[in-house]
Amino acid sequence: APTGAYICGREDLVELCSYVWTAPGLGAEMGSYAASYRPFFEGLFLAPHITRQAMMSAEFCAAVFKVLGFDVVPEPGHLRTDLITAITLGSEENMCSFAEAVQNWSPVDSDAVPVPGPMPGYTDPIIMAAGTFVQGSTIEMSADGPVRPPYIMYFQGGLVFEHTMLAVMGAAEKILAARGGLED
């Protein structure tokens, strides 16, 4: 475990182990986590703010794409129970444009080009965009969805609201450009 361990046995051997696991002379007096609890407490401190940033990002995404005429769930102003916004984009081209914009605006692997591909457990190709610091992170900005009618993209996360705003606007711009602009 990254935050400690249990040692049992003869008392003198347990004490010897404690010096090997921490530092000579410190032994069990050092505590269970030599690397410190700072990252743990930092996470507890930042979690409410980052969660709020992601919730604001989801709400912004829903509002932008609702104004552009796309079906979104949940709709802006409605109760949210998670960070995900489902956007019915209506075409594979729109899904790919959305994913490309999210990837382009990502802090990691922004030069990668998302393309639909097979994934175990799915019968349809999946497109994913996630230039995240932590692979598989759900609080960081990402988008994915099965490439099949009605072409729903699932957008989630965002560590920094202003950054996610740029990505959402980039996705809207890409989709609008492909269809020739904003419709009345």
Question: Where are each of the predicted segments found?
Answer:
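Active-site C-terminal subdomain of aminotransferase-like
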Residues: A1-N94, K174-D184
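Conserved C-terminal alpha-helix-loop-beta "cap" of PLP-dependent enzymes
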Residues: K66-E183
